Amino acid sequence: MTESASCHGGGVCGGLAQEEGQRQVFCGLTSIVWLHRKMRDAFFLVVGSRTCAHLLQSAAGVMIFAEPRFATAVLGERDLAGMADCNEELDRVVHELLARRPEIRTLFLVGSCPSEVIKLDLGKAAERLTAAHEGRVRVLPYSGSGLETTFTQGEDQFLTTLAHELPASPEGAPSLIVLGTLADVVEDQFRRLFDQLGIGPVHFLPPRTGADLPPVGPGTRVLQAQPFTGEATRALIRRGAERLDAPYPLGVEGTRSWLQAATRSFGVPDEQLEAVIEAPIARAQAALERQRGVLSGKRITFLPDSQLELPLARFLSEECGMQPVEVATPYFDREFHGRERDALGEEVRLVEGQDVDAQLDRLRADRPDLTVCGLGLANPLEAEGLRTKWSIELVFSPIQGFEQAGDLAELFARPLVRHETLKV
């Protein structure tokens, strides 16, 4: 994050309090769990420790009926002590992997805390391996290290690497890139809406296969679908693209404004947009109405975890009648998150960063009806009588767009309904 994008140090900056201290977050390797499902001809090889391997195996434990598209090249004690040639062993592992999995077209070498501590140059390794397998596979490096990051930034690093690999578009050729991983069903819904609006060509990054990397250039518009794509967006801007300023497509109003940013950029009249989205909005409003009775008036606190906190709080406040007490986010980027912050108003306590002990003290004093937090904090808070929602579930679930608005609201209603059902 650049200095202009965020204030640094403790205190309050532009109405946003900042905290530094002990944190409770997953590292960027966790993003592989959803990225490997998206790019179907890619493979993610983590160069890390046994701890890295255990994290991925635990996070992706549901993948028991299919061979996953990720693995860990484990650095042993001799590697970490500098007593072995890591590059030679890495080459051997990659050669065996490609011989066993001939369908791989793009291989990502994913850096970890251990590989970065011993300064293993995965960039040079990727160049060497690409040359060794020329015409067979493209090898690309990126960092999934947990040093000073949160888990969704793993996707940002991944997308930034892809941004550098995109082909150049013809000078001035108009196109739209939707940036950030979306569930296939959501992607298909958005594509149909863009087709009905006459906007195109539309590309989604990341694509479903490495062969579908979109071109980028001066005529390209970028529409962020996820709030944790800041560095990738800047990389596309450096390639000549233009970012469209919009809220994130959560809920009816977020999705409408998100689509409107695209239609106005492409010269589509507002009347045409409203005609196209009238039916989806009606379905979304009906689905939301079923959840408002549970959510309206309830108080909610977000602990920092995924960077989805601000747009989720905006959706729950505007469309479900919830009252955000404190909304904390791991990183705040004024350029990309400012609209979402402004929508929450002055009465909501906003925090960037984490001092987990201080935040837990405030949480116990506030006693909100629902707390959105990481897995490691959920059970202890439940034991204290606080109802919780796992933040990582909101990253894995299809929540964007009109058709998912009711499902998104239901994700927050479930723990409240469960609590009332189990109350003695």
UniProtKB/Swiss-Prot annotation:
Entry binding sites for [4Fe-4S] cluster = 27, 52, 113
Question: Pathway listed for it?
Answer: Porphyrin-containing compound metabolism; bacteriochlorophyll biosynthesis (light-independent)
GO terms of biological process kind:
light-independent bacteriochlorophyll biosynthetic process; photosynthesis, dark reaction
- Domain of life, per UniProt, equals Bacteria
- Enzyme class (EC, first level): oxidoreductase
Catalytic activity reported: chlorophyllide a + oxidized 2[4Fe-4S]-[ferredoxin] + 2 ADP + 2 phosphate = protochlorophyllide a + reduced 2[4Fe-4S]-[ferredoxin] + 2 ATP + 2 H2O
Per the entry, which co-factors are needed? [4Fe-4S] cluster
> Could you tell me what the cofactor note in this record states?
Binds 1 [4Fe-4S] cluster per heterodimer. The cluster is bound at the heterodimer interface by residues from both subunits.
**What keywords tag this UniProt record?**
4Fe-4S, ATP-binding, Bacteriochlorophyll biosynthesis, Chlorophyll biosynthesis, Iron, Iron-sulfur, Metal-binding, Nucleotide-binding, Oxidoreductase, Photosynthesis
Pfam families, A to Z: Oxidored_nitro
Molecular function (GO) terms listed? 4 iron, 4 sulfur cluster binding; ATP binding; metal ion binding; oxidoreductase activity, acting on iron-sulfur proteins as donors; oxidoreductase activity, acting on the CH-CH group of donors, iron-sulfur protein as acceptor
Give the E.C. number(s). Answer: 1.3.7.7
- Is Cell membrane there in the keyword field? no
Gene3D superfamilies, A to Z: Nitrogenase molybdenum iron protein domain
Q: What does this protein do?
A: Component of the dark-operative protochlorophyllide reductase (DPOR) that uses Mg-ATP and reduced ferredoxin to reduce ring D of protochlorophyllide (Pchlide) to form chlorophyllide a (Chlide). This reaction is light-independent. The NB-protein (BchN-BchB) is the catalytic component of the complex.
Record's PANTHER family?
Answer: LIGHT-INDEPENDENT PROTOCHLOROPHYLLIDE REDUCTASE SUBUNIT N (PTHR39429:SF3)
Describe the subunit structure. Protochlorophyllide reductase is composed of three subunits; BchL, BchN and BchB. Forms a heterotetramer of two BchB and two BchN subunits.
Protein family (similarity comment): Belongs to the BchN/ChlN family.
Please report the name of this protein according to its UniProt entry: Light-independent protochlorophyllide reductase subunit N
Q: Which organism is it from?
A: Halorhodospira halophila (strain DSM 244 / SL1)
